[in-house]
From Swiss-Prot:
Gene3D superfamilies: Glu-tRNAGln amidotransferase C subunit, N-terminal domain (1.10.20.60). The gene is gatC. This is Aspartyl/glutamyl-tRNA(Asn/Gln) amidotransferase subunit C. GO terms for biological process: glutaminyl-tRNAGln biosynthesis via transamidation; regulation of translational fidelity; translation. The keyword RNA-binding does not apply. SUPFAM superfamilies: Glu-tRNAGln amidotransferase C subunit. Allows the formation of correctly charged Asn-tRNA(Asn) or Gln-tRNA(Gln) through the transamidation of misacylated Asp-tRNA(Asn) or Glu-tRNA(Gln) in organisms which lack either or both of asparaginyl-tRNA or glutaminyl-tRNA synthetases. The reaction takes place in the presence of glutamine and ATP through an activated phospho-Asp-tRNA(Asn) or phospho-Glu-tRNA(Gln).
């Protein structure tokens, strides 16, 4: 499937790329080679191949949730530069 420089220009316009004429010609040749290779891959008979989600047999390895004691409000707020009424105080933005 040969791509013309005009088709490359159209794709470049959609991608908002500015290409020189030499680049358009070079990309047309390179993209043609890529598309030809993909066409060859499409010809493969994969009817006997089982669909894969992942190439390796990896499964989720999960651990049991364990509730741990949290920090107190005083401990958490002790790191803040400004605190007011048990809350972080930050400078006004607007």
């Amino acid at each position: 499937m040969a791509l013309s420089p005009e088709e490359v220009n159209h794709v470049a316009m959609l991608a908002r790329l500015a290409l020189s004429e030499d680049e358009k010609t070079a990309f047309a040749e390179q993209l043609t080679l890529i598309l030809d290779y993909v066409e060859r891959l499409n010809e493969l008979d994969t009817g006997e191949v089982e669909p894969l989600i992942h190439i390796l047999p990896v499964f989720n390895v999960l651990r049991q949730d364990e509730a741990l004691p949290g920090s107190s409000q005083e401990e958490i707020l002790s790191n803040a530069p400004l605190v007011e009424d048990g809350q972080y105080k930050v400078p006004r933005i607007i």
